[in-house]
Swiss-Prot record:
It comes from the Archaea. The gene is eIF5A. This is Translation initiation factor 5A. It comes from Methanothrix thermoacetophila (strain DSM 6194 / JCM 14653 / NBRC 101360 / PT). One of its GO terms (molecular function) is ribosome binding. Keywords: Cytoplasm, Hypusine, Initiation factor, Protein biosynthesis. It is found in: Cytoplasm. The keyword Ribosomal protein does not apply. InterPro entries: IF5A-like, IF5A-like_N, NA-bd_OB-fold, Rib_uL2_dom2, Trans_elong_IF5A_hypusine_site, Transl_elong_IF5A_arc, Transl_elong_IF5A_C, Translation_prot_SH3-like_sf. Gene3D superfamilies: 2.30.30.30, Nucleic acid-binding proteins. The lineage of its organism: Archaea, Methanobacteriati, Methanobacteriota, Stenosarchaea group, Methanomicrobia. SMART domains: eIF-5a (SM01376). CDD domains: S1_aIF5A. PANTHER family: TRANSLATION INITIATION FACTOR 5A FAMILY MEMBER.
């Protein structure tokens, strides 16, 4: 799910969709309007799910999409080699979430963990 917003309303720490990938805004810089042009904004962001750096430059009146990112909690059912099986604590659905090697020692069956969900993708949120 996503909503449409103007670039002028965005701030650091909010989410934006760049190249069909939800990203978190790391920096935003506004330039002054020129003699014949509108004010521009440069947005630097990092992908939530792929950690790639992306940036866009556009007029501040441009409408862009902001994803709706949900932070949920789930219970670990089983830990595999490259993924973990979670059960959502609200609607009791079971999902497979990919994990990295450094996350494995922190996960064990029965433990409650937070995860992010947006645009059909899921990521563990271990801090």
């Amino acid at each position: 799910m996503k909503e449409q917003v103007e670039i002028r309303t965005l701030k650091e720490g909010r989410y934006i969709i760049i190249d069909d990938e939800p990203c978190i805004i790391k920096s935003i810089a506004h330039s002054k309007p020129g003699k014949h042009g509108a004010a521009k904004a440069r947005i630097d962001a990092i992908g939530i799910f792929d950690n790639q750096k992306r940036s866009i430059v556009a007029p501040v009146t441009t409408k862009v999409y902001a994803p709706i990112v949900e932070r949920k909690t789930g219970q670990v059912l089983s830990v595999g080699e490259t993924s973990v099986q979670l059960m959502d604590l609200k609607d009791y659905t079971t999902i497979d979430v990919p994990i990295t090697e450094d996350m494995k020692p922190k996960l064990e069956p029965g433990k409650e963990v937070a995860y992010l969900s947006s645009m059909g993708k899921v990521k563990m949120d271990i801090r």
